[in-house]
């Protein structure tokens, strides 16, 4: 058996030595792997019509325009259009921020729950990416992770779902929905480059007409809503979802939880018209009466 195996190996080696070497010159496709190409001139007209058929508009040089259906009313005119995507490029976009991700950022220490939270803290924590030049108008708080959210926070977002509001207020937190115009939004998410330019902080613009109803509605926790109606809406939401609403006035963090921005204010603790001097680490405040009247209006 061993002798036959040795002779078999030697025989195979001798056969390989006698065969030509594999190169680009002797490579061929496997039999049947390629179909023979059909040469021109083998069809009905034997190549005399150049593949255009016999007479007619298609045989000559001009072709009908795209959508032409031989004279009858074309499809795109007979079927009425409906504006499914009307104004799509002008719609405001809000990036979703789930309660699960917010709790994750708090657990990692990227977001400090003992301080008011707005877009500046969320973007610095790499929790959201907002691009005002692409029609982004902020973030929307969604209810994913409401069952595991356990932080007591004072957060300002642009939109929030009802269940997300209930999950935060159940823990003794506060939610505020605020509007920022594109310029104010750009300053809010990138404050340092703005401060380095040495410009006064501008006034935040009020919401457009189609958003006034949303931000004046207490059920949405709008920043333009009546505070007394917001307190009533908090109690109604607690009854709806069956939890006891904590009394934040007796909380040790009541000062932080009750912190609000003025409707014209962009940053917490910085009023419109102030200039932040990054080099000297100072804040310059206007003293002229006309400037004070303008920025307070």
From Swiss-Prot:
It is found in: Mitochondrion. Pfam families: Ribosomal_L27A. SUPFAM superfamilies: Ribosomal proteins L15p and L18e. Keywords: Mitochondrion, Ribonucleoprotein, Ribosomal protein, Transit peptide. Residues 36-53 have a biased composition (Basic residues). One of its GO terms (biological process) is translation. The keyword Transmembrane does not apply. Gene3D superfamilies: 3.100.10.10. Its main location: mitochondrion. Disulfide bonds: none annotated. The keyword Hydrolase does not apply. Residues 23-69 are annotated as: Disordered. Residues 1-21 form a transit peptide. GO terms for cellular component: mitochondrial large ribosomal subunit. GO terms for molecular function: structural constituent of ribosome. Signal peptide: none annotated. Belongs to the universal ribosomal protein uL15 family. Component of the mitochondrial ribosome large subunit (39S) which comprises a 16S rRNA and about 50 distinct proteins. PANTHER family: 50S RIBOSOMAL PROTEIN L15, LARGE RIBOSOMAL SUBUNIT PROTEIN UL15M. This is Large ribosomal subunit protein uL15m. The lineage of its organism: Eukaryota, Metazoa, Chordata, Craniata, Vertebrata. The gene is MRPL15.
């Amino acid at each position: 058996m061993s002798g036959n195996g040795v002779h078999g190996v030697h025989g195979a080696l001798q056969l390989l030595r006698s065969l030509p070497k594999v190169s680009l010159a002797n490579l061929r496709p496997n039999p049947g792997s390629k179909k023979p190409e059909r040469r021109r001139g083998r069809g009905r007209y034997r190549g005399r019509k150049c593949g255009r058929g016999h007479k007619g508009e298609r045989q000559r040089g001009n072709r009908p325009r795209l959508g032409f259906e031989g004279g009858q009313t074309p499809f795109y005119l007979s079927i009425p259009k409906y504006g499914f995507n009307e104004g799509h490029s002008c719609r405001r976009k809000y990036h979703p921020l789930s309660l699960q991700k917010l709790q994750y950022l708090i657990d990692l220490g990227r977001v400090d729950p003992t301080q008011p939270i707005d877009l500046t803290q969320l973007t610095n924590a790499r929790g959201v990416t907002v691009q005002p030049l692409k029609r982004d108008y902020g973030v929307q708080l969604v209810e994913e992770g409401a069952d595991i959210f356990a932080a007591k926070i004072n957060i300002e977002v642009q939109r929030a779902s009802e269940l997300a509001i209930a999950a935060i207020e159940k823990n003794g937190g506060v939610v505020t929905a605020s509007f920022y115009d594109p310029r104010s939004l750009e300053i809010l998410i990138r404050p340092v480059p703005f401060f380095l330019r040495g410009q006064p902080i501008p006034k935040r613009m009020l919401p457009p007409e189609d958003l006034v109803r949303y931000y004046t509605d207490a059920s949405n926790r709008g920043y333009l809503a009546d505070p007394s109606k917001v307190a009533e809406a908090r109690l109604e939401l607690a009854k709806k979802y069956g939890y006891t609403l904590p009394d934040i006035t007796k909380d040790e963090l009541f000062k932080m939880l009750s912190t609000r921005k003025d409707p014209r204010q962009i940053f917490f603790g910085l009023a419109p018209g102030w200039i932040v001097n990054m080099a000297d680490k100072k804040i310059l405040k206007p003293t002229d009466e006309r400037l004070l009247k303008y920025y307070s209006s």
